[in-house]
Amino acid sequence: MSEKFRLRRTMMFANAQKPSLVKDAYIYKPDSLIIDLEDAVSENQKDSARFSLYHILKTVNFRGVERLVRINALDTPHWQEDIRVCVAGGADGIRLAKCESAQDVIQVEKAVEAAEEEFGMEKGKTLLMAALESPGAVLNAVEICKASPRLFGIALSGGDYRRCMHTRPTISGSDIQAARGYMVMAARAT
């Protein structure tokens, strides 16, 4: 149940390897549930996490909560199989970790299109979201936002961004305020 322009005020992350927690996530009434295949899953557990994800997507009644999946970054050997499982399972959308450029979005879009065709899914059904985690990615935000009609949003991954910037979190969030502001302008301008 996904719409490109639906209201997304709250996004709850859940580990794909913990179906017992994922199945009850609707209780908290998030606008979107992001099932994680990336940071929450250790390297040697990626295959079993995808297996779990597929069964979660196929069997759990999310009661109207949007089902997004955070896939592994493009610099890993996992992202293509992540996409195939997301599409085969019927995920509403995919959150691309460590998106650096419009080309990253286009590469993921092509893989999603191929998977939709392979699994007989409606073309264009699977939406995309880009997580920007570096200063370079933030500076590329306008091009990233224009990269695909499937893209419904961009998000700043604050922890990773801070590591790249060699800064520490502040109570006010002033350390990431400029990046957030630029990303809002980029999203609004496109």
Language model: regions and residue ranges:
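Expand to "…catalyze enediolate/carbanion chemistry for C-C bond making/breaking, isomerization
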Residues: 1-190
